[in-house]
Structures are given as C-alpha cells and as structure tokens.
A protein has these predicted regions:
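Intrinsic disorder/low-complexity detector
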Residues: 1-2, 85-101
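Solvent-exposed residues in well-ordered beta-strands and their adjoining turns
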Residues: 10-12, 56-58, 97
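Short acidic/glycine-enriched loop/turn segments that link adjacent beta-strands
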Residues: 46-49
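Short, structured motif recognition centered on aromatic/hydrophobic residues
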Residues: 3-8, 19, 30, 51-57
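An amphipathic, aromatic/His-enriched active-site/gating alpha helix that lines ligand/cofactor pockets
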Residues: 21-38, 56-93
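Short, surface-exposed ligand-recognition loops at beta-strand->loop->(often short) alpha-helix junctions
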Residues: 11-21
Length: 101
C-alpha cells in the first residue's frame, strides 16, 4: 500500500527565509535517497509560522529504509544540522496518509 508522509512544521516566523533554504535543499536530496518528494510549502498569506512537506513511498518499510539512507547521506546530514543550528523549526509533526480509493 502506498503512503504519503505529511510533515507539518511550526516555524519561527522571523526565520522563514532559512526554512525556504532548508526546503529547497531537499529538492535534490530526497529523490537521491529514494523518496518521491511531492513538494514543500511555506507561509505566504495568513498564518505566518506553518510550513509543510509531502513525500510519497510504496510502503512504511520503504519510508524507513529511505530515512536511514537520508541520515547517512552527507548532504542530508548537513541539512539536518543546518536546521538544528539555526533553530527555525520549532516543532515537527509527521502524519502517514493513505489514499482514498
């Protein structure tokens, strides 16, 4: 069964540019590590501290294998460090979704 991972980020609204840099880096890193990146979104109008990302996988096992590759990837690890050092992500929630058919 295919799954989509929905990630909801609570952001520091004064560091949205840093989140945009972070999200842009995933555009190449996620596919390289085996994820199907559907996109990342950031605040435009209205609520100014919520960003999101969607990635699809063939199964939960495929997501777990991808996450292991992502943590071992040099660029992936660097992007995680960037987020930790800059502290623009205040919290992160993951929801695993399945399509309605």
């Amino acid at each position: 069964m295919s799954i989509t991972v929905f990630i909801r980020y609570q952001l520091d609204p004064f560091q949205c540019d840093a989140f945009e840099d972070y999200a842009r880096r995933w555009l190449t890193i996620i596919p390289k590590c085996g994820g199907n990146l559907l996109g990342s979104w950031m605040p435009h109008e209205g609520t100014n501290n919520i960003g999101s990302g969607l990635s699809a996988f063939d199964s939960l096992a495929a997501d777990e294998a991808y996450r292991a590759r992502l943590k071992a990837d040099r660029e992936g690890a660097a992007n995680f460090r960037f987020a930790q050092e800059q502290r623009f992500i205040l919290s992160e929630e993951r929801t695993f979704l399945r399509p309605v058919t």
